Design a protein with these regions (language model features):
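Extended, highly charged
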Residues: 1-178
Length: 178
């Protein structure tokens, strides 16, 4: 068995070892409709008509207008991949989810510098621009804007101070707002 998945890098490493589960391309793609179109035919295995077929996850290494960015798409698009990433079988995913909800793991506070904080962009910075920072794809010309489709939001309730992490589909609506 490969090393346990603990972050995006180890997840990609695992998928690379699995036949037909990850494709990487060096061909430049435009995040405006082209990226989603390529994935629709390669990763989703055809059109969006149901049933969507299972295809590989993809990494786009060259994004038009974003010379230092890559886009990973479809990492969680099949039960087979999700099960492999969680070191279980597809038929066990429901039970695993139920068990995790019933037995939450408390957060771990780490001392020192966090690797995820090596690069920090703040909306108050004069050159802050979400359109330049995030190569979020616009799936069709009719979309409201570029979407981060698996956006992780860390939020704090303004009155209680309770924190939570949630997953949302986030649309970039201005250079400072999602």
């Amino acid at each position: 068995m490969a090393e346990k998945v603990r972050d995006l890098r180890s997840a990609l490493a695992l998928l690379e070892q699995m036949p037909d589960q990850l494709i990487e391309t060096e061909v430049e793609v435009d995040p405006m409709a082209e990226l989603a179109g390529v994935y629709r035919y390669v990763g989703a295995g055809g059109t969006v008509k149901r049933p969507t077929k299972e295809g590989p996850a993809m990494i786009f290494n060259r994004i038009k207008g974003h010379p230092d960015a890559k886009v990973a798409i479809g990492l969680l698009a099949s039960r087979k991949r999700v099960a492999a990433l969680l070191d279980t079988q597809p038929e066990n995913l429901g039970k695993m989810l139920c068990k995790s909800v019933e037995n939450p793991i408390p957060p771990v506070d780490l001392e020192g510098d966090a690797p995820c904080q090596q690069v920090v962009h703040k909306a108050a910075d004069p050159d802050f621009d979400l359109y330049k920072l995030v190569p979020a794809p616009t799936n069709t010309p009719d979309d409201a804007g570029p979407y981060i489709t698996l956006g992780m939001c860390y939020a704090t309730h303004p009155d209680t101070g309770v924190h939570d992490v949630t997953i949302h589909r986030l649309c970039t609506v201005s250079y400072t707002h999602l």
